Amino acid sequence: MAHEGEKHMNWAEEIVKTLKDWDTSMIVYVPDISIHQVTSLIDEDPYFRLVSATREEEAIGIAVGSYAAGRNAAVFMQSSGFGNSVNALASLCIPARTPIPMFINLRGGPGEFNLAQVAMGRAVIPIMDQLGLPHFVLEDDGKMDKLLDGAMKLCHANRQPLAICLTQMLHGGKIA
């Protein structure tokens, strides 16, 4: 809860703050309307370098290259695209011990209107479990600052990729 005179940050502002707190200035994303609120804030901020990728595995490759060059990176994608990134994660990011936080718009939950999103949305967490990929699900912005900071600490201390799944309950979802 915000104190007198403090403005409560929304979920997108909280993510931007956390990325800055963890010196994560290279942001690679596959465009998606549900994450537009956060990527537009990033795009407006000169601290960040925002790179649009055509596919999710390309985004992972760019982020790993950025980290190898000395610049912390994060990736934003949709859950259906997470399926596209599995090989890049399993054969590059995980064995190279690259700390890449991935912010994933998790589709297929309450309020989903597109049946094609449901199967992959349900498969994301079990796939992450099989890869040994730590993951957290954000359904509201309560204690979001602590969860994001803890996730970033885990990601960097263990030098491993990590997923932060953003649900439709958090960001409002897509409109049919």
Please place each PLM-identified region on the residue numbering:
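Thiamine diphosphate
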Residues: 2-176
